């Protein structure tokens, strides 16, 4: 996808952008996995998209933007900017960018979208597509969160999701499929955040792609997310 932003750019981000533009997502939820988890082959699940927006921090480290959902919402955990696809959205990229604009005031023109990765199917049959974009000019972004949806906006180093630090896990099960739910603790100033479950899983996958190495712990993801076994993810 062509770059929309001009001027001097971080070479680290340029290199990452070029590499990610070549990424080809593997096949997602296969028919056998659908049948195993009670999802009809002809099902047309609801669709959503999230934005993995990457920028370079002051120390030269990659950072990804996250939000703490408003306490007014039924789910007020940490999440990536994003939401459900609307009728007027042309594609998943537009959904992710529109939602990021609405939720945190991120101007779509600031984001260079480079790729999408394999979709995830939630247990509620919602297909979630992670869209990866580069924010070359971090100074041009002044977060203006929608108070009805977002309590705060913060950023973390994606590499933390490959490390066995400030992490714990709990075994969960759904329809006979046992898997691990991962919890990552992060401190930003005086605020503490817990990144877990679905959001953590997406960020583990993103970090694996970015740094081209597996996490330092057993991931054991649920099969129903996208039908790709852990042993095969390591080959991608």
Task: Tell where the protein language model's regions lie, with residue ranges.
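Non-catalytic RNA-recognition surface used by pseudouridine synthases
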Residues: 169, 173
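Acidic, glycine-rich loop-and-strand cores that form catalytic or ligand-binding grooves
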Residues: 138-167
